[in-house]
Amino acid sequence: EALYDICFRTLKLVTPTFGDLNHLISATMSGVTCCLRFPGQLNSDLRKLAVNLIPFPRLHFFMVGFAPLTSRGSQQYRALTVPELTQQMWDAKNMMCAADPRHGRYLTASAMFRGKMSTKEVDEQLINVQNKNSSYFVEWIPNNVKSSVCDIPPVGLKMACTFIGNSSSIQEMFRRDATSLTAMFRRKAFLHWYTWEGMDEMEFTEEESNMNDLVSEYQQYQDASAEPXXEQEEDYEEA
């Protein structure tokens, strides 16, 4: 759904094909793994990504984005600046996930830049974004945006950026899925295909509860505040 929206609204493609969708996916995946394949000023790896992006084991569902968005075979004639890349990267229209990050808060995030650029400028831009949009970041995880810079840009581009965010707004997708699951399960639609293969109806009930618990957990950490911990410390000092 999000990929088709990007093709229609951003790339202005009238009839996007699976090739167009795969182009967006491959560009994003290439950006995620570029630090494993190319040298860079500030490299990263998948282990570091996992450690920095997953604050709790169950909350491991990410939103990804890419900037600049280009269609297949297109050539970029004007190089974007780091501020422009950063602005596009955080834009909800660039997210390849059918959830609006403005409806939640970022627990953690990672920005992977590619091309010749200053790491100082990258860090400054990310700090500016956090300061200007502090309400969209949880306050109880400080310095929760990680950055990396790879010197080799993608083919056809001079600069690019891949974004991975662990946002509580992804619960929108789980809510939609849970609503569809509940509606179909009550009618027992398509259930026989699974019971014939040895599954039990209770497994679907458990998964429905599991999904609702996941939504509640995301909401809980979205609403969590760092203030109670400070109050507890004051009480402890007084005692």
From Swiss-Prot:
UniProt-recorded Gene Ontology molecular function terms: GTP binding; GTPase activity; structural constituent of cytoskeleton
Asked whether the keyword Cytoplasm is assigned, the reply is: yes
Species whose genome carries this gene: Anemia phyllitidis (Fern)
Keywords per UniProt: Cytoplasm, Cytoskeleton, GTP-binding, Microtubule, Nucleotide-binding
Name the positions where GTP binds: 22
Q: What task does this protein carry out?
A: Tubulin is the major constituent of microtubules, a cylinder consisting of laterally associated linear protofilaments composed of alpha- and beta-tubulin heterodimers. Microtubules grow by the addition of GTP-tubulin dimers to the microtubule end, where a stabilizing cap forms. Below the cap, tubulin dimers are in GDP-bound state, owing to GTPase activity of alpha-tubulin.
Subunit structure and binding partners: Dimer of alpha and beta chains. A typical microtubule is a hollow water-filled tube with an outer diameter of 25 nm and an inner diameter of 15 nM. Alpha-beta heterodimers associate head-to-tail to form protofilaments running lengthwise along the microtubule wall with the beta-tubulin subunit facing the microtubule plus end conferring a structural polarity. Microtubules usually have 13 protofilaments but different protofilament numbers can be found in some organisms and specialized cells.
What are the boundaries of the region Disordered?
Answer: 207-239
Name the protein family. Answer: Belongs to the tubulin family.
Q: Where in the cell is it found?
A: Cytoplasm, Cytoskeleton
Q: Which gene encodes it?
A: TUBB3
Q: Where is the composition biased (Acidic residues)?
A: 230-239
**InterPro entries recorded for this chain?**
Beta_tubulin (IPR002453), Tub_FtsZ_C (IPR008280), Tubulin (IPR000217), Tubulin/FtsZ-like_C (IPR037103), Tubulin/FtsZ_2-layer-sand-dom (IPR018316), Tubulin/FtsZ_GTPase_sf (IPR036525), Tubulin_C (IPR023123)
What is the recorded name of this protein? Tubulin beta-3 chain
